[in-house]
């Protein structure tokens, strides 16, 4: 049998806190002022369809506290350190690296007279016409350009 508790549950009783409407409006005013005073880019690109323009950051993630507890404080020295790799991880990386080098050698000609199965490189017989004008983009370069544009537009 189920029992019904009196009063609201802890989940319902917790209130949401966030910036006040005045803080939101002042921040919006600052961003709009910064955008209107920004110079136009030399190479204008079409904006992809979506809820945010390219120059604005994506939505901010907000994590709520569990049971009203604060998250454990992290020291700044721990944030910059890398996670230590396990021996199994290093062994897997070494195995994949050696296997890939072996495949590259066999594709490049490799030792002559070696019998047995060789790797086969996939070549598409009927290329997709939509991909005829496809140009790959360097994401690191693109993000660097966006970062520099943001810095120059707000300074």
Curated annotation (Swiss-Prot):
Transmembrane segments: none annotated. It is found in: Cytoplasm, Stress granule; Nucleus. The modification N-acetylmethionine is found at residue 1. Coiled coil: none annotated. The keyword Phosphoprotein applies. Its main location: cytoplasm. It comes from the Eukaryota. One of its GO terms (cellular component) is cytoplasmic stress granule. Interacts with DDX6. Interacts with MCRIP1. It holds the Pfam family FAM195. Belongs to the MCRIP family. The keyword Transcription regulation does not apply. Keywords: Acetylation, Cytoplasm, Methylation, Nucleus, Phosphoprotein. This is MAPK regulated corepressor interacting protein 2. Residues 1-59 are annotated as: Disordered.
């Amino acid at each position: 049998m189920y029992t019904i508790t009196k009063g609201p549950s802890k989940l319902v009783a917790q209130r949401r806190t966030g910036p006040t409407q005045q803080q939101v409006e002042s921040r919006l005013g600052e961003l709009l002022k910064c955008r209107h005073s920004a110079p136009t880019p030399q190479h204008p690109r079409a904006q992809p369809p979506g809820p945010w323009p390219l120059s604005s950051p994506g939505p901010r993630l907000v994590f709520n506290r569990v049971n009203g507890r604060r998250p454990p404080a992290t020291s700044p020295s721990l944030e910059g350190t890398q996670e230590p790799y396990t021996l199994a991880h290093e062994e897997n990386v070494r195995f994949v690296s050696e296997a890939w080098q072996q495949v590259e050698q066999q594709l490049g000609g490799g030792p002559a007279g070696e019998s047995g199965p060789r790797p086969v490189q996939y070549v598409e017989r009927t290329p997709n016409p939509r991909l005829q004008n496809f140009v790959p983009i360097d994401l690191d370069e693109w993000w660097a350009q966006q970062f520099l544009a943001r810095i120059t537009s707000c300074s």
